């Protein structure tokens, strides 16, 4: 058993059993896994569960209650309730917790107080690419023998779990690793704490990957997000390191508000750069104009090469030399739901990707295009995120989807006029609200050699399996 201190309330009571409200989310599911490994009794509740998190929780033997009813409080009788940001006032379970005066805490605060405060935290922040970049960074440290803990919003193929405590490093079998890699999310913490999650983490090494407007349901504009990112910058110690995308003016503007930490930039001649990109997808790594390494991998897109530069810089801060980092990246396997091949039937390949913001959609299609050349790409989109449902980003969607040969957008559950917003795509656009008819329309328009790229941040009704079955 890992010797972690149990959480104590202010009156000295030991909080051994935690019950997680919203346990099915990628972050809270990761908190559950870490708490279980640390010796806590863990249970939780959520409305709907999707793989891979549902599979992970089941494998860990964690009891999950379906729904947010108040009766579960008597069923589980937890010592403290860890509240995810899916929870809202008005939910029966939340009102009961408040009315009964039961102890509660947010997921990020629980993690910070019980795990992170003891470790060298490496935080990966940015509007896009957090999960992939955090997975790369955790793997590079693992490959180097540093055995980090991590909590990532997806399941890295190199690890098969989304979260774990620090393990025994190769160099010192009598200790535990000091390193912990975390996906540092800008979304708000909980209904009672509207600060971004990452404010709780206090990283010693922070990657700022990119910054643009997103999460229109909680942020009024880009300035509001920049304010939260600057709160993160304020928490990085002067002996730490900020690794920053040098191509993003929005990040430079954030640093200009005040920065007390050394900064290394990537994507610029003054820092880390992608050198020659070879036909097989491998690329050279340059630092201050000099070629210092080479990465051979199968990942698609310039965005992933930029992610790699950030990881090499951050890993070097933790003591990993450049060559070892490049070797590790060459052995990196991507995260589930990041351009994940779900199957191939009759020469037609179906992919699954988490992309749900115009920039991420565009770079995902661009990456696939680089891989498949002139073969047809059928983009299948579910506008499911809160920002997408509000229609805040609808004007940017046509350009982001333009490189696809055919575009299929599922309009079920969306209040804005999808056909009107995506009209610039012309005859290659297909919009549907009936799910079964939507699947049939995709299949009708396929031909051998096609690549069907499904993009959603939810389960999308199991569309991948339905497509593969219908294509037989």
Language model: regions and residue ranges:
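ATP-dependent carboxylate-amine ligase
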Residues: 1-65, 77-79, 99-102, 171-173, ...
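Phosphate-binding loop of NTP-binding sites
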Residues: 7, 13, 34-37, 58, ...
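Short, polar loop motifs at secondary-structure junctions
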Residues: 47-50, 68-70, 87-88, 246-249, ...
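Generic structural signal for helix capping and beta-alpha/helix-loop junctions
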Residues: 52, 74, 114, 158-159, ...
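Beta-strand->loop->alpha-helix junctions that form or flank phosphate-binding loops
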Residues: 65-69, 107-112, 151-154, 258-278, ...
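BRCT (BRCA1 C-terminal) domain core and associated BRCT-interaction motifs
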Residues: 67-80, 85
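Glycine-rich beta-strand-to-loop/alpha-helix junction loops that act as flexible
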Residues: 84-86, 246, 454-459
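Acidic-glycine-rich active-site phosphate/pyrophosphate-binding loop
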Residues: 275-293
